[in-house]
């Protein structure tokens, strides 16, 4: 793959073969910004997990202490009092069957979809549309709930979802390059603590194989996992 000049220049800032302490890795990531805009800072945890084992197929959500810097559009499927709560929480779209019908016609002007359990039977028919886009509500991520007020507030305050991919990686957003280093550090440590808290008992050997941090379109910087827990 042909790389741009900025990408190649960023490679001179650090050693791709070296593993860096957390604080230094974050500092280097901010220096390697390739994009002209306020780039997203991303993190990937490579875990020693087997997707074939049900208890090792990690999926969940957490609220980052300093958010992600990204404003998400939230759609809520609810009726009555719960619909009012969604509006109170400043959800971008609130509806029931009317919203489901709209989605069925390929409307996806939202980033997260929240639904009450009552709405799931109707919504489940759209699994083929929502599933591939990662938009299907799920109890594990808190997007199927009766407490829509809390759900919307958490999403607006920087809640992220994480899910193990086929290669054993969990890839998430940590924030923006404009965040100061302390905020990015705390966000990453929060994610680390969450992954440690949900570590399956059946894991054998080293749980976290590697951790990498990068900004949009920039090369990844390896982090020493031991320094994250310090």
Swiss-Prot record:
Disulfide bonds: none
GO molecular function, one term: rRNA binding
Any single GO CC term annotated in Swiss-Prot or TrEMBL for this entry: large ribosomal subunit
Entry-linked CDD domains: Ribosomal_L1
Entries under Gene3D superfamilies matching the protein: 3.30.190.20, 3.40.50.790
Domain of life: Bacteria
InterPro entries: Ribosom_uL1_bac-type, Ribosomal_uL1, Ribosomal_uL1-like, Ribosomal_uL1/biogenesis, Ribosomal_uL1_3-a/b-sand, Ribosomal_uL1_CS
An example Gene Ontology biological process: regulation of translation
Keywords: Repressor, Ribonucleoprotein, Ribosomal protein, RNA-binding, rRNA-binding, Translation regulation, tRNA-binding
Quaternary structure and interacting proteins, as annotated: Part of the 50S ribosomal subunit.
NCBIfam families with a match to the protein in the record: rplA_bact (TIGR01169)
Function, in words: Binds directly to 23S rRNA. The L1 stalk is quite mobile in the ribosome, and is involved in E site tRNA release. Protein L1 is also a translational repressor protein, it controls the translation of the L11 operon by binding to its mRNA.
Family: Belongs to the universal ribosomal protein uL1 family.
Protein name in the entry: Large ribosomal subunit protein uL1
Organism: Aster yellows witches'-broom phytoplasma (strain AYWB)
């Amino acid at each position: 793959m042909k790389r741009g000049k900025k990408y190649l220049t960023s490679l001179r800032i650090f050693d791709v073969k070296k593993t860096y302490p957390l604080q230094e890795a974050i500092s280097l990531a901010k220096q390697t910004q390739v994009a002209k805009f306020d780039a997203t800072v991303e993190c990937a945890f490579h875990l020693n997990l087997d997707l074939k084992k049900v208890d090792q197929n990690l999926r969940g959500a957490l609220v980052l202490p300093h958010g992600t810097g990204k404003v998400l559009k939230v759609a809520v499927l609810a009726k009555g009092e719960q619909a009012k709560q969604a509006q109170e929480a400043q959800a971008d779209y609130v509806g029931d069957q009317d919203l489901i019908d709209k989605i069925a016609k390929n409307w996806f002007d939202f980033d997260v979809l929240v639904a009450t359990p009552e709405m799931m039977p109707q919504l489940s028919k759209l699994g083929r549309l929502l599933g591939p886009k990662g938009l299907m509500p799920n109890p594990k991520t808190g997007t199927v709930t009766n407490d829509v007020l809390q759900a919307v507030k958490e999403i607006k305050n920087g809640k992220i979802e994480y899910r193990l991919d086929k290669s054993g990686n969990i890839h998430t957003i940590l924030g923006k390059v404009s965040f100061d280093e302390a905020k990015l550090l705390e966000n990453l440590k929060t994610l680390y603590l969450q992954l440690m808290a949900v570590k399956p008992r059946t894991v054998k050997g080293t749980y976290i194989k590697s951790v990498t941090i990068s900004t949009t379109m920039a090369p990844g910087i390896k982090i020493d996992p031991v320094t994250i827990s310090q």
